[in-house]
Amino acid sequence: MEPGTDVRRVLVIGAGAAGLLIAQVLKKHGVPCTVFEQDTKADARPRDWNYGIYWAQSYLAECLPPELVSQLESAQVDSHTPSGSDILPTFNLATGEPLISVSAPYSYRLQRRKFLNLISTGIDIQYGKRLTMVDSDNKTVTAVFEDSSQATGNLLIGTEGAHSRVREYLLGKERAAVIPSRIVASATVSRLPEREVSALRKLHPRYCIAIHPDGYFNWLGIHDEAAQSKDCTFMIILSWISESDTGLSGTAIAADLKERANTFGEPFRTVLQSIPSETTFWHNRLSSWPTQPWNSHNGTVTLAGDAAHPMTFHRGQGLNNAITDAAYFGRQLAALDTKSTESLSAVVTAFEEELWKRGNEAVTQSDINSLSVHNWEELKSSPLFTSGLKQRSST
């Protein structure tokens, strides 16, 4: 390709929040882009969850057109209008007594599926495209998919999550592998009896955290608000440190959670033990990958979102950093005089310089926080207690 040739196409692998927001940024700046998603359709996954935007609200507004920004509240778990007095209350899981109220001004709590549907508006997405290979000649890059189809562009951005194939291509399997955490978690989205809904929402209408001196962390929050309490669904997560494999799967996950809840204070014990027996649970060991520099093959391949900085969830930093990735990529694009392949390479270089440092700090701090909130002696010095939900630097 001759110097100064116009950018033909950017390939984005993964239609999660990071991928779709980067696609919106590229569209905003007139750069052709296609998103390739391994799922066969937008709602193919049976599991949904929710997440918070705590400090990246202005970055998000940089990524989206005004007509989508104005619809963000419609993607929330409830009808709450963000305000400066928003908090996330934290309780003692053994006694039910309040611990602290974490400030969360103007925060959004978004249903993942609703949010992705909103930010996919106007984006070219190809579904059923599971990546099998990446090949760059330092000028163009080709993605090969499981269905034998291929796509070629001037830049490929891997945004396909913690177990990124693109990250493996850039760093090799060993260096790209996530690091298993000492922490395991059981999670569900479930309806609850009306009495338990009322008890929970008296603590806070939207959500709360409860932490046990014996090393448990419990998240309880609205996932889908309904007019009738009996129709509301809640996302519930219980995590703890386990050095060995728990062996939990199927119905054993719920039974184990309810057994552990025997030592919890009210209303948490009754809430957890009232989860209907037919409810589906998930159980997994957490993992992370402290961001490290990679060879972007002359700016033709890079990473963003969980592919660049997969982290533990206990301080809600993952989505905020994914949004920041997209916003910073957009800022670098906005500074260009042209959209040539050479200038796009310069965008990638500047983008990665900021991302590598911020991503490593975010992952490291999230790991520290996750271990601290499972250790009663260290809880008060945890990033959650000392910095709340806002962005924190390790320096």
Curated annotation (Swiss-Prot):
Q: Which residues are glycosylated?
A: 138, 298
Any Pfam family: FAD_binding_3
Broad enzyme group: oxidoreductase
What molecular function terms (GO) are annotated for this protein?
FAD binding; monooxygenase activity
Which keywords, in A-to-Z order, does the entry hold? FAD, Flavoprotein, Glycoprotein, Monooxygenase, Oxidoreductase, Signal
Enzyme Commission (EC) number: 1.-.-.-
Its signal peptide is: 1-23
Query: InterPro entries per the record?
Result: FAD-bd, FAD/NAD-bd_sf
Positions annotated to bind FAD: 37, 52, 112, 306
Annotated SUPFAM superfamilies: FAD/NAD(P)-binding domain
Its required cofactor(s), as named, are: FAD
Q: In which pathway does it act?
A: Mycotoxin biosynthesis
Q: What does this protein do?
A: FAD-dependent monooxygenase; part of the gene cluster that mediates the biosynthesis of the mycotoxin cyclochlorotine, a hepatotoxic and carcinogenic cyclic chlorinated pentapeptide. The function of cctM within the pathway, if any, remains undetermined. The NRPS cctN initially catalyzes the condensation of L-serine (Ser), Pro, L-2-aminobutyrate (2Abu), Ser, and beta-Phe in this order to produce isocyclotine. After the dichlorination of Pro2 catalyzed by cctP2 to produce isocyclochlorotine, the cctO-mediated transacylation of isocyclochlorotine can furnish cyclochlorotine.
Q: Which family does it belong to?
A: Belongs to the paxM FAD-dependent monooxygenase family.
Tell me what this protein is called: FAD-dependent monooxygenase cctM
Q: Which organism is it from?
A: Talaromyces islandicus
Gene name, per UniProt, is cctM
